[in-house]
């Protein structure tokens, strides 16, 4: 777009280098190429190693929580070495640098989690004392809520690494996002899909977000061509809900918004890490009020749980 030369690079995407992150970046690139009728090769992809990729020996909530998978990419964006970033929405902090924003989300993939185990057909089929490996506090807490007789431990790594760890017995089972398996062509690895009414997904799960500089009119117009309005509405409710709670990785939080025409249905949950204390709420309302409904749901749960609920786990 800086030149009429058909071989010039139009824009550079910044992304993590994991297979899933690269699959997401290529999906964005291909959609942009179709929307603007240009060769995909004219949109470059630059991989950036993040803190979350480098630190594999500790749980995320012990080393900074959210932002670990975006910080270095945002730094490249602000420095101008990339034109926009592609993220998994659930990795994006609720508060962005002042100079950046999320101008577009791709159409949302399946939001559900999946149960994976070589030993059992479902979470309920695992024997007492079996170990479920997951680095997600939300998943750990919900496993313990449903099956307090199970053990949970941290299982880090990209999708393929976690699948390998399960296959060699580092845990009896794990939980992953179905969206990630679908994007990698690994959906056949799912033992059982967990419905949202029993296992509420993470805020933003299944949605690919594009982050750009607010003042870059050229790039903002470029990426908005592939934005999905329904996903944007759903994420506005979910992210406003998260922003008013503990938006780090220290408090297990689930949230999911469904968009039905000009109406939305939202469900939100906060839960203690051991699964014994939880608060849930729902909201229905106009699509135009999505952000306000998410915020209202958060205010209700914060009031019901009390500040002690959040301060107790902030230091956990």
UniProtKB/Swiss-Prot annotation:
It comes from the Bacteria. Keywords: Porphyrin biosynthesis, Transferase. GO terms for cellular component: cytoplasm. It catalyses: 4 porphobilinogen + H2O = hydroxymethylbilane + 4 NH4(+). InterPro entries: HemC, Porphobilin_deaminase_cofac_BS, Porphobilin_deaminase_N, Porphobilinogen_deaminase_C, Porphobilinogen_deaminase_C_sf. The porphobilinogen subunits are added to the dipyrromethane group. Tetrapolymerization of the monopyrrole PBG into the hydroxymethylbilane pre-uroporphyrinogen in several discrete steps. PANTHER family: PORPHOBILINOGEN DEAMINASE (PTHR11557:SF0). This is Porphobilinogen deaminase. It comes from Nitrobacter winogradskyi (strain ATCC 25391 / DSM 10237 / CIP 104748 / NCIMB 11846 / Nb-255). The gene is hemC.
């Amino acid at each position: 777009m800086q030149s009429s030369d058909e071989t010039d690079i139009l824009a550079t995407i910044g992304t993590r280098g994991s297979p899933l992150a690269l699959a997401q970046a290529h999906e964005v690139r291909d959609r942009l190429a179709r929307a603007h009728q240009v060769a995909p090769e004219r949109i470059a992809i630059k991989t950036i190693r993040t803190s979350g990729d480098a630190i594999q020996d500790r749980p995320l909530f012990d080393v900074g929580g959210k932002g670990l998978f975006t910080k270095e990419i945002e730094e490249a964006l602000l420095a101008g070495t990339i034109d926009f970033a592609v993220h998994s929405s659930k990795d994006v902090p609720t508060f962005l640098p002042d100079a950046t924003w999320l101008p577009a989300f791709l159409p949302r993939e399946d939001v559900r989690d999946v149960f994976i185990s070589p030993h059992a057909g479902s979470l309920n089929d695992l024997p007492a004392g079996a170990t479920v490996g997951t680095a997600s506090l939300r998943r750990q807490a919900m496993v313990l809520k449903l099956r307090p007789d199970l053990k949970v431990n941290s299982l880090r790594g990209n999708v393929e690494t976690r699948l390998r760890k399960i296959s060699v017995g580092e845990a009896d089972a794990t939980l992953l996002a179905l969206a990630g398996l679908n994007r990698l062509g690994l959906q056949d690895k799912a033992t059982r899909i967990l419905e949202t009414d029993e296992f509420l997904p993470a805020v933003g799960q299944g949605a690919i977000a594009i982050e750009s500089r607010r003042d870059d009119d050229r790039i903002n117009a470029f990426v908005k061509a592939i934005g999905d309005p329904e996903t944007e509405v759903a994420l506005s409710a979910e992210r406003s809900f998260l922003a008013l709670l503990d938006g780090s990785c220290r408090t297990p939080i689930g949230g999911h918004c469904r968009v039905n025409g000009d109406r939305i249905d939202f469900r939100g949950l906060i839960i203690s890490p051991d699964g014994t204390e939880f608060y849930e709420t729902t909201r229905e309302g106009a699509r135009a009020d999505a952000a306000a409904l998410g915020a209202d749901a958060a205010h209700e749960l914060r009031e019901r749980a009390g500040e002690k609920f959040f301060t107790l786990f902030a230091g956990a």
